[in-house]
């Protein structure tokens, strides 16, 4: 998800997306630990997406 798309969302929607992405990251970490995750780059992409969402949420709240 691009930053421009995130900025068009409302604060509540961004928070919901953060929760969803955090849950997905938890599941991906668990799959990685058990050796079931084939695409390990997906874990890093999700981590960066959460960081991007949190950064833009702070911008919106100011």
From Swiss-Prot:
<keyword id="KW-0687">Ribonucleoprotein</keyword>
<keyword id="KW-0689">Ribosomal protein</keyword>
<dbReference type="GO" id="GO:0003735">
    <property type="term" value="F:structural constituent of ribosome"/>
</dbReference>
<protein>
    <recommendedName>
        <fullName>Large ribosomal subunit protein uL29</fullName>
    </recommendedName>
</protein>
<dbReference type="Pfam" id="PF00831">
    <property type="entry name" value="Ribosomal_L29"/>
</dbReference>
<dbReference type="GO" id="GO:0006412">
    <property type="term" value="P:translation"/>
</dbReference>
<dbReference type="GO" id="GO:0022625">
    <property type="term" value="C:cytosolic large ribosomal subunit"/>
</dbReference>
<dbReference type="InterPro" id="IPR018254">
    <property type="entry name" value="Ribosomal_uL29_CS"/>
</dbReference>
<dbReference type="InterPro" id="IPR001854">
    <property type="entry name" value="Ribosomal_uL29"/>
</dbReference>
<dbReference type="InterPro" id="IPR036049">
    <property type="entry name" value="Ribosomal_uL29_sf"/>
</dbReference>
<dbReference type="InterPro" id="IPR050063">
    <property type="entry name" value="Ribosomal_protein_uL29"/>
</dbReference>
<comment type="similarity">
    <text>Belongs to the universal ribosomal protein uL29 family.</text>
</comment>
């Amino acid at each position: 998800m691009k930053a421009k798309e995130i900025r068009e969302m409302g604060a509540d929607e961004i928070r919901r997306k953060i929760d969803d992405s955090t849950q997905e990251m938890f599941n991906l970490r668990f799959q990685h630990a058990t050796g079931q995750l084939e695409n390990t780059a997906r874990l890093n992409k999700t981590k960066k997406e959460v960081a991007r969402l949190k950064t833009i949420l702070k911008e919106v709240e100011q």
